[in-house]
């Protein structure tokens, strides 16, 4: 059985084709700059990689080329081999608590909820409509980023604002990266042979969120009404005093949208360091005895402190923790980042194994044997999680 996992952006379409018999990727790729000059696509398969410039006016054009190439490159013999298509969907509000078969109602809801994810939900609809046109008889499944967090109770998801903001306008914590956090919880539970774990999952890439998981369910998460809340990130501020917005509007002569744009795109590591949004660039100059080194250190220390603070908060919320998991670009690959966060948690009995912590992108325990909390690097695989959900729902 073969399933395609799809992540459709406003001008891009990322795919992975899985053979569900062994859960392996047969082919993957990316269609870029859809509807923009200079569009192209990349396909990786069988140890090879091709990149071709092509006119991609619409997402449907991209899907047609994708399916044509899967056959012409002998990746599959015919389109009949494709049993299902799983779509990453960003925002399902509190209506969608788990993955579901995509129906007209789902598509209508994605459009209805577009104000909650104005960049992503309309793009997700474009991806769905493209596959619907080209593969009309193949079932499609929607996997929502927000779904995993719908097990939070009111105490966790309500904001201390007028209740009517929630009841009338849907203002509440939704959380994101849910598919990744769910994959981490599933993987670590399977590896350790336990379902009743208290897990603190740290998805830290250019965007980042921390999630408290108990018995496989989300109890609390750091991102909120939007992905701007929570820990400091590559270009996002994370939590700030909301009064800063009106103050900066007055001081800089900006409107609210412009300030929010700065908090989303010019803050975080980039804003504090004035060097880069990439932790590798920060770590590269952090020991310099100059102004750049000073800037890098202040950004690194603030970043790791915000992550530490959420882990410590969730340790208390869960009544302790059995395991801390690091995942995504930074979590999987940055030895200095993990080392500093774990050093900050020493008062909880967390101890790092320096040699094990050198691991990059592999599943590995990085805490020492006498650490009171086990710490693991767990590579995430949202595409596989989408494929697994699709398989389950179409079987």
Cite the ranges covered by each PLM segment:
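Short beta-strand-loop/turn "lid" adjacent to the catalytic site in phosphate-handling enzymes
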Residues: 70-120, 141, 147-156
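Adenine-nucleotide phosphate-binding core of ATP-dependent small-molecule kinases
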Residues: 261, 268-272, 279-317
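Glycine-rich phosphate-binding/hydrolytic loop that grips phosphoryl groups
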Residues: 353, 357-395
């Amino acid at each position: 059985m073969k399933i395609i996992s799809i992540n459709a952006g406003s001008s891009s379409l990322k795919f992975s084709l899985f053979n569900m018999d062994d859960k392996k990727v047969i082919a993957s790729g990316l269609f870029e700059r859809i509807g923009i000059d200079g569009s192209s696509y990349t396909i990786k398969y069988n140890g090879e990689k091709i990149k071709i410039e092509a006119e991609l006016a619409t997402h449907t054009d991209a899907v047609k080329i994708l399916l044509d190439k899967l056959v012409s490159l002998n990746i599959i013999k015919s389109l009949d081999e494709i049993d299902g298509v799983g779509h990453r969907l960003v925002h399902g509000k509190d209506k969608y608590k788990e993955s579901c078969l995509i129906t007209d109602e789902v598509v209508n809801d994605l459009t209805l909820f577009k104000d909650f994810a104005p960049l992503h939900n309309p793009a997700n609809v474009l991806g769905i409509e493209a596959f619907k046109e080209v593969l009309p008889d193949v079932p499609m499944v929607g996997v929502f980023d927000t779904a995993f967090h719908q097990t939070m109770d009111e105490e966790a998801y309500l904001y201390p604002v007028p209740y009517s903001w929630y009841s009338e306008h849907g203002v509440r914590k939704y959380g994101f990266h849910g598919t990744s956090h769910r994959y981490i919880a599933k993987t670590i539970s399977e590896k350790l042979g336990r379902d009743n774990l208290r897990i603190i999952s740290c998805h830290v890439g250019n965007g980042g969120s921390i999630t408290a998981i108990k018995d496989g369910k989300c109890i609390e998460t750091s991102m909120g009404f939007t992905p701007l809340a929570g820990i400091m990130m590559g270009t996002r501020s994370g939590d700030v005093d909301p009064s800063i917005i009106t103050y900066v509007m007055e001081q800089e002569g900006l409107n609210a949208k412009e300030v929010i744009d700065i908090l989303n795109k010019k803050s975080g590591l980039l804003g504090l360091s004035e060097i880069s949004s990439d932790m590798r660039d920060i770590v590269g100059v952090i020991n310099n005895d100059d102004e750049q080194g000073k800037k890098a250190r202040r950004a690194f220390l603030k970043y790791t402190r915000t992550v530490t603070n959420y882990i410590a908060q969730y340790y208390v919320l869960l009544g302790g923790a059995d395991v801390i998991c690091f995942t995504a670009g930074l979590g999987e690959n940055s030895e200095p980042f993990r080392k500093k966060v774990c050093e900050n948690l020493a008062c909880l009995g967390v101890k790092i194994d320096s040699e094990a912590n050198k691991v990059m992108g592999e599943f590995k325990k990085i805490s020492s044997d006498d650490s009171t909390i086990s710490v693991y690097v767990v590579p995430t695989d949202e595409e596989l999680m989408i494929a697994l959900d699709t398989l389950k729902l179409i079987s």
